[in-house]
């Protein structure tokens, strides 16, 4: 496993729509392992392939049980409720803004071997599912905020 360089806001790759994964091979497994290692080293909650320079529909997300889920070709199939809270991004370091997302999200995705499964999450996990899947369509959370939060506002939240 290796830690990959995280692409920062302003890089054009973060605005591109990712292509589906069709080959479930050793290269994919290596990328998934590297993405998980990168997520752990960055102390993040989620990471999408374009954030490490790869235009494929792949994300890794920390779930409600503190396990890292690998989501390949993911799609949101159900949402419920609403939550508004501070959100940040490894590609926009040190900046946070208030974003409204569903309180509960269920996704359908493939695992590293191509098998379809469903995963669900509340609160932070639901937020991460939405945030990371948005990356796969070339969107950043900054499109949903009025302004960045000050350090004081973030500490008081």
Feature names for model-found ranges:
Residues 1-157:
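Positively charged
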């Amino acid at each position: 496993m290796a830690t990959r360089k995280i692409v920062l806001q302003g890089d054009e790759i973060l605005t591109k729509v990712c292509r589906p994964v069709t080959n479930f091979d050793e290269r994919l497994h290596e990328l998934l392992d590297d993405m998980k290692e990168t997520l752990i080293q960055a102390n993040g909650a989620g990471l999408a392939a374009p954030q490490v320079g790869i235009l494929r529909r792949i994300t890794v997300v920390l779930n409600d049980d503190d396990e890292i889920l690998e989501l390949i070709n993911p799609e949101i199939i159900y949402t419920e409720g609403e939550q508004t809270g501070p959100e940040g991004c490894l590609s926009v370091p040190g900046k946070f803004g208030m974003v409204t997302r569903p309180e509960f999200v269920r996704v359908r995705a493939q695992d590293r071997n191509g098998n379809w499964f469903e995963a669900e999450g509340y609160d932070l996990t639901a937020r991460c599912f939405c945030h990371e899947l948005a990356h796969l369509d070339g969107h950043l959370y900054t499109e949903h905020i009025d302004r960045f939060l000050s350090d004081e506002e973030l500490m008081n939240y």
